[in-house]
Amino acid sequence: RNAIRVVGSRGEMGAGHMADAYARARKGLGCFITSTGPGAANAPGALVEARFAASPVIHLTGQTATANMDKEQGAVHDVMDQLGMLKSTSKSAYRIRAPEMALGVLMKAAREALTPPMGPVSVEIPIDVQRAKITRPAMLDNLVIAPPAGDAGNARSLDALADMAASAKRPMLWCGAGARYAGAAVQRLVDMGFGVVTSVNGRAVIPETHPMTLGAFQATPEVEKFYETVDFMLI
């Protein structure tokens, strides 16, 4: 309480893009909130962009009272199958059906958003659940939700890959969005003589002013011709 900085936006889609940008810039979890119904329906454009960019984002939205959900009874902003809409544009979407489920669902959503391939996860919270009072979980005092540990890989395969890289005369890195979280490793390979090209979402893994990068121009005819001169490419 009183430790969350709330930044307002002019619309729900803008809020989603702001959360996406925060996740990319801070290399952490972004979050935005929308109202139910039309408010939630304004979010999918931003959710699709975050999903395309593999940005870990939590989208919290409302829902009509649990007794009225999915019945088309004319409750305010009761959109039929709102959860289905969010599932189609998010990595996953969940509904908190009871107050005691809230922390567990939110933790699951955060972990899923942070699990590669990262992406946005939506969570519906019905209005009566929002208003309910529960005992504050003690685990909140020391709660840390970290990305899951990466796969260490097969040692023999990694050794073979290292041998190939060491013997290469013209090695190249092709970095996508996931490489944003491995900037130090990318820089080390660049310092060893690797050239770099990135996808649009992999931009800024290293500064595009660096003499060893071709930036995000990975599909131009000139660069594709250049690939033919490369004897080792790590993607």
Named regions from a protein language model:
Residues 1-235:
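N-terminal alpha/beta PP-like core and its mobile active-site loop of ThDP/TPP-dependent enzymes
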